[in-house]
Design a protein with these regions (language model features):
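C-terminal helix-cap and adjacent tail motif
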Residues: 111, 194-240
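Phosphate-binding core of ATP-grasp and ATP-grasp-like enzymes
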Residues: 111, 116-128, 159-172, 194-200
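Short histidine-centered catalytic/ligand-binding loop motif
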Residues: 38-48, 132-154
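A short glycine-rich, hydrophobically flanked beta-strand micro-motif that places a catalytic Asp/Glu
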Residues: 71-76, 166-181
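Active-site loop/lid in soluble adenylation, ligation, and acyl-transfer enzymes
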Residues: 2-122, 233
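Basic/polar N-terminal segments that are highly enriched at the extreme N-terminus
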Residues: 1-4, 238-240
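Conserved metal-phosphate-binding beta-hairpin within the catalytic cores
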Residues: 93, 173-192
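A long amphipathic alpha-helix within ATP-dependent nucleotide-binding catalytic cores
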Residues: 142-174
Length: 240
């Protein structure tokens, strides 16, 4: 499947039309950003590892009952996906406190939460992706009650499935964000990506950070850490 026209360009991914009106090509670039785009850098090889990492995770979730937009990997940096009508919402689950919630609530980094904590955020870089709740979503027409409940249900299921996958590879899934959209058949599918760019993964013994916090905090070895996570999961990352 060939790319025809770029229709969306984000901070680290682009979407292209194809000969099929229901399918898009998702391209993963080496571009890396943090703090709503205020810190930027190109990290050689990150796009390839993220594309193939995402495919591995999406395939694993599909096998465990989570419908996703992923169809197939086309090459090292491109994947074919279903075209969706996206919700302008990020769904976040936290198993431990880290990042923005520590700043917001003054909690210690790494605090183990009694239960997984679910949060909604509005997807808007200019506003800093503000925290929102169900009432905001319904009042502004971003999703209805049934869609909200389905997104919550699927996000919790993603957490259950992936926590087990990662802990079996000596990794702690600290938190993650996911996005959803509606396909042409009307089903809500997991969309966008699941990579170390959008989750926190710590070594279960040393608590070493293996995710994009290495970029945010200037720890270095970002792509190398992504490869280490992929290796632990048994992936064979190919670079064209």
């Amino acid at each position: 499947m060939e790319k025809i026209k770029e229709i969306t360009k984000g901070k680290a991914k682009s979407l292209f039309t194809t000969s099929s009106e229901d399918q898009l090509v998702m391209h993963f670039s080496d571009d890396t950003s943090a703090f709503d785009g205020k810190k930027k850098e190109a990290l050689l090889g990150k796009g390839a590892v993220n594309n193939q990492f995402n495919a591995f995770i999406m395939d694993h979730l599909e096998k465990n009952g989570v419908e996703t937009h992923h169809i197939e990997v086309l090459n090292s940096n491109d994947s074919l996906v279903c075209k969706l009508d996206m919700f302008p919402i990020e769904c976040v689950i936290r198993n431990r406190a880290s990042g923005s919630i520590c700043r917001r609530l003054g909690t210690e980094d790494g605090l183990v939460l009694e239960n997984p904590l679910f949060e909604f955020f509005l997807k808007d870089d200019d506003l800093g992706d503000p925290l929102i709740n169900d009432e905001h979503i319904i009042s502004f027409g971003w999703a209805n009650k049934e869609q909200i409940e389905k997104m919550k249900e699927l996000t919790y299921k993603v957490n259950t499935v992936l926590k087990e996958l990662f802990i079996n590879s000596n990794l702690i899934l600290v938190d993650f964000k996911v996005e959803f959209g509606v396909c042409s058949q009307g089903n809500i599918l997991l969309a966008d990506e699941f990579t170390p760019d959008g989750c926190r993964l710590w070594d279960s013994e040393t608590l070493k950070k293996m995710d994009k916090d290495r970029f945010r905090q200037g720890l270095g070895d970002v792509v190398e850490s992504y490869h280490q996570v992929a290796d632990r999961l048994g992936m064979n990352i190919i670079v064209d």
